[in-house]
Amino acid sequence: MEKAQGARRLAAAHHQGVLCTNSAKREGYPFGSVTPYALDGQGRPLFLISSMAVHTKNLAANPKAALLVSEETSEEGLLSGARANLLGSVAEVPDAEEPAAREAYLAQHPAAAQWADFGDFAFYRMDVAEVYYVGGFGMMGWVSASDYAGANPASEG
């Protein structure tokens, strides 16, 4: 459970990562986008993205994606910092759940309220299938979706 706790703490402490999608233009190639996110109560990443963005077009063709979140470290300590790869499927948040997603997202990114209602923007959510967590040298491994969702980000272990 230590890795699950670490992954949840890391994802909760940061608000941007690299969203990796499968390129719709170049089949078989990954496409990474620096993307702000927030978490819902289950630790699922929420995104506010435009239909014009390449990553949104990629998700429409293939919803499987990864979100890489890492600690901000100096060049000397880059590999010793924690990082997590959240793997899952990304889809637009259903209308009935949009108010809760909006509230969670705008709490972390209040400036996004300026464009949240533009016609080409919508809230998306990743349903996490599995997480690969690296807590530094010697602490790494896969975390199940249920362990990740059940971990308390405020807990120290």
What do these predicted ranges mean?
Residues H14-V18, A111-A113, Y133:
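Short secondary-structure junctions and interdomain/linker hinges
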Residues Q16, G43-P45, N62-A65, F118-F121, ...:
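Short, surface-exposed beta-edge/turn micro-motifs
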Residues Q114-G157:
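C-terminal edge-of-domain segments
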Residues M1-A60, L68:
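An N-terminal domain-cap segment
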Residues D40, S50, A91-V93, D127-A129:
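Solvent-exposed residues in well-ordered beta-strands and their adjoining turns
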Residues R8, A112-W115:
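A generic local secondary-structure boundary/capping motif
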Residues V18, G32-P36, N85-L87, F123-R125, ...:
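Conserved hydrophobic/aromatic beta-strand scaffold that supports enzyme active sites
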Residues V54-Q108, F118-F121:
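Short, structured beta-strand-loop surface elements
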